[in-house]
Amino acid sequence: MENLKIIWHGHACFSLIGKKHVLVDPFLTDNPVAKVKPEELKPDLILVTHGHSDHCEDASKISKNTHAPVVAAFELSEILKEEGTETIDINPGGTIEYEGIRVKATIATHSSSYNGRYAGNPMGFVIDMGRKIYHAGDTGYFKDMEAIGAMDRPDIALLPIGGHYTMDVDGAFEAVKAIKPAIAIPMHYNTFDLIRADPERFKALAGTVGTYVIIPEIEKPIEI
């Protein structure tokens, strides 16, 4: 099975690196905990879960620097095209394949706008790079996470735990029980005061149902 390296850049931004480099939710320029600059990242494909600036602030810039297309909801894709960004549009339930990477969009319970403009449905992604990674995007817990677990069978789940705008630790624990991943990695917490959360508590809860939680450190690679 292909080796996978996961690098957390803070907030909900991850590099998933196998034979190709997939970058999810690039938010670096105004991210107070980020340690890399947009121009330092060289992805082959960029995924954006929704239009809020703390998830796609640097998508166009990185795309133009690297020629990596941005996968986004149809409405957000059309807006990014106006900026001269190469995009691949998708909507929940849809699947795209790009250079051996398979990406399926899932629903997410959130909102989406881009500079005040409606930006389509918020989404999560199941990314198949030999192993399946579910990036939930910004979302609360929803019952259909059981279907994601049953149908898509992700090996790894990247789940928000910060509360306020997304599910909190308890909601993420419900997500773990629904999805049943072997590994879970918390995200979208401790970037700002409003989303303070304790990842150790999440780790303890998830361990009671057999999911191993890896608490990420910014820019420290996780080898799986």
From Swiss-Prot:
Keyword Repeat annotated: no
Keyword field: Hydrolase
Gene3D superfamilies per record: Ribonuclease Z/Hydroxyacylglutathione hydrolase-like
Xref: InterPro entries: Metallo-B-lactamas, RibonucZ/Hydroxyglut_hydro, UPF0173, UPF0173_UPF0282_UlaG_hydrolase
MF terms (GO), sorted A to Z: hydrolase activity
Pfam families: Lactamase_B_3
The family this protein is said to belong to: Belongs to the UPF0173 family.
Record PANTHER family: UPF0173 METAL-DEPENDENT HYDROLASE MJ1163, UPF0173 METAL-DEPENDENT HYDROLASE MJ1163-RELATED
Name listed for the protein in its UniProt record: UPF0173 metal-dependent hydrolase Ta0764
